[in-house]
Structures are given as structure tokens and as C-alpha cells.
Amino acid sequence: MVSRQEQFEQVQAVKKSINTASEEVKNQALLAMADHLVAATEEILAANALDMAAAKGKISDVMLDRLYLDADRIEAMARGIREVVALPDPIGEVLETSQLENGLVITKKRVAMGVIGIIYESRPNVTSDAAALTLKSGNAVVLRSGKDAYQTTHAIVTALKKGLETTTIHPNVIQLVEDTSRESSYAMMKAKGYLDLLIPRGGAGLINAVVENAIVPVIETGTGIVHVYVDKDADEDKALSIINNAKTSRPSVCNAMEVLLVHENKAASFLPRLEQVLVAERKEAGLEPIQFRLDSKASQFVSGQAAETQDFDTEFLDYVLAVKVVSSLEEAVAHIESHSTHHSDAIVTENAEAAAYFTDQVDSAAVYVNASTRFTDGGQFGLGCEMGISTQKLHARGPMGLKELTSYKYVVAGDGQIRE
């Protein structure tokens, strides 16, 4: 096993091969990575079978689905890499140019961060997404996967590095930390001088640990306590469709809905219809029904478990939905601001004034009007695959694409000027 220190030194030694690579060279490298990923399908699936067998019975079925790979999912990962090839290279972009009275010309240019560390949990597709985005944005990357997905991640990284071996980019610009202990995560948090940026992708425990302990710069990819508010002026059919999609299409992801707020004027008519769609119809179709966690008012209209206080502060990542009836738009917004993780929140309404109030007052990275929160995604936003969803305000916010993985520098051109 290569030590963490050796890996940090290896990536530092070769980072310039990607930091200063041309767009053509980077694109050739990405295409080779995608081709080798597909070519290694058999090996990746064998590794994934080991991870799945080890995880079965230890994690939920929803989490098992996040871990699971098949040939179609591997092809989708390769397609994601190829989509990054089609995106414009951000490196070298001139952001601003100005000329001072003394003749100095100051140009603000976009540059690579350098080396980016990613700590993430059991999601194999993050491996290929992270590698593609970091390399296209001119960065080397150090990956630290969750233990549950290590065999799969190792097979994916092996394929990606074999692709790089056919190009002029050194394969060591992608590093996978072999030690899956907690100590390896903390070592990355303390790797000042080796990592220029650290991005955690996972649950609240992981993200909080990184934010609280890291001495390297961090972009916080927050958990998603995502709300949908059904206003008194909502179109109920529209609301049913949006909620069904936001909650059931993929409940294990961070942009999935976790909390429903319903105006009291809508509760009696809307909640029974919602129960029919999310519970009865799903049972009839052989699908897992949604379990409701209901406040006292909501429980008057539908069946479910009484909500505990913590249910409105929980990212369930499962077929569970907390439901609260509110007396006004203002109460809905106040609840969201008290409980939201500032990821994605939505209002369903036909009232333009209510929509404007909601979008002005809700301080989240993505605020929706009459649309599913599942659109908070780099691909859906036209950014290609994403590095994560930032819930902080400094440097990056919302889906992080190529530009969010860069910095800038000032190039100052003169003709012998000196400061008086």
C-alpha cells in the first residue's frame, strides 16, 4: 500500500502536467478515460459484486441502489465524461482587462486550483465525475472513497489511469487513497501544502467533520433538507406531479424532497389526493409506498406516523416524507428558513406575488417556482456532470461545474513602470 504522504508527493510532482495542459490534450485524455472505463466493464462489475455482497444487510435498499452498477450505468458514467469534453475549457479565460493611467495593463485570468481532494461515500459515479471535472478544469485530484465502495472505486480508477497512460497526461494526476480508515480522511483535512481545495460529498456526519476539522480550504456540499410548499393558490394537479417526482424518482439523492408544507386552505382537498398517489397507487403498482410523518393538523386528513421535532430536520434519503400544515406563506417561509440546509426549496403557486415573495425570502442555492427540486443538478443546469451542490456562499454556490473548480490570477504587463 502506498502511503498517503507518498501519494500527496506523487500528485504534487506531476500536477503541472495537467495544470498547464492545452484543451486538446485534456480532451484527448478524457476520451481515453471514457473508452477504458467501458472496456473495463467486466472488471468493474466483478469488483462491484464484491462491494454489494459485503454491504447487503448493512445498508438500506436505497443506499444499495446508489452503490450498484450494471453495464448501462457504466456506459452512463463514460457518457458523462464525454459530455465534459464538449464543454468549453475555462482555463485561460480572460475575466477582466483594464489599463491604468500609468500604462499598466491588468488582466484577470482564470487558472486551475492545483490539486483538489474529494472525500465521498458509496457512490461509484462520483469517481468518474470528479476525475473528469478536475482534469478538464486543469486540476489533479486525490480521491478518498467510502469503504463500502472501495473495490468498485479501485477498479474505476484503475481503468481511468490506464486511459491516461495512452496520453501525455501523467496517470498520477489521479490518486485514490487506499486507506479507507477515518484517519485517512483526517489526513486529507490537514494536508495543507498538498491539497489546494477539499470537497466532501456525503451525509451530514462527513460534511460536518470536514468543515469542523479541515485546515485546507473547503467547499461545503450541504445535505438536502429540501422543502416543497403548496400554496393556497396552487394548481393541485401540478403539485401532485411535482411532489411525486421530487420525492419518489430517486429518494437517496440530495435534491430529493424531504418536507412538505401545505397551506391550511389546501390541506383538506390536497392531502387525501397526495396519499392516493404516494401510498395507494404505489402499493397497487408494487412500489414502496411513502411513509408520512405528520404534524397534528396534517394527521386530520391523512394517515401516518406522528411527526417528531427532529423529522423536520432530517435528510431521510428514503421513502419517508415529513408533512406540516401552515397558516400562511409567511409561516412556510419562516419554517424553511429555520430548518432548511439552503440546498433547494420550491413553491407551487399560480400567484405571481406569492412566488416573488418566496424567491426573495428563501435563502437557498436553488429556489423553484412550479418545478421539481430534482433539477438541482449539474447536468440539468447545463454544466455537465457536477462536483456536488455547494450550500455555502463563498466561492461557489449551487451545482459546481468546471468554473467553480478554478481560481484566477492577475497578469500585469508594463513597459518599465516603477511605483513612485
Curated annotation (Swiss-Prot):
PROSITE patterns: PROA (PS01223). Its main location: cytoplasm. One of its GO terms (cellular component) is cytoplasm. It comes from the Bacteria. The keyword Oxidoreductase applies. GO terms for molecular function: glutamate-5-semialdehyde dehydrogenase activity; NADP binding. It is found in: Cytoplasm. Pfam families: Aldedh. Keywords: Amino-acid biosynthesis, Cytoplasm, NADP, Oxidoreductase, Proline biosynthesis. SUPFAM superfamilies: ALDH-like (SSF53720). Its EC number is 1.2.1.41. One of its GO terms (biological process) is L-proline biosynthetic process. Pathway: Amino-acid biosynthesis; L-proline biosynthesis; L-glutamate 5-semialdehyde from L-glutamate: step 2/2. It catalyses: L-glutamate 5-semialdehyde + phosphate + NADP(+) = L-glutamyl 5-phosphate + NADPH + H(+). HAMAP family: ProA (MF_00412). Catalyzes the NADPH-dependent reduction of L-glutamate 5-phosphate into L-glutamate 5-semialdehyde and phosphate. The product spontaneously undergoes cyclization to form 1-pyrroline-5-carboxylate. Belongs to the gamma-glutamyl phosphate reductase family. This is Gamma-glutamyl phosphate reductase. It comes from Streptococcus pneumoniae serotype 4 (strain ATCC BAA-334 / TIGR4). The lineage of its organism: Bacteria, Bacillati, Bacillota, Bacilli, Lactobacillales. The gene is proA.
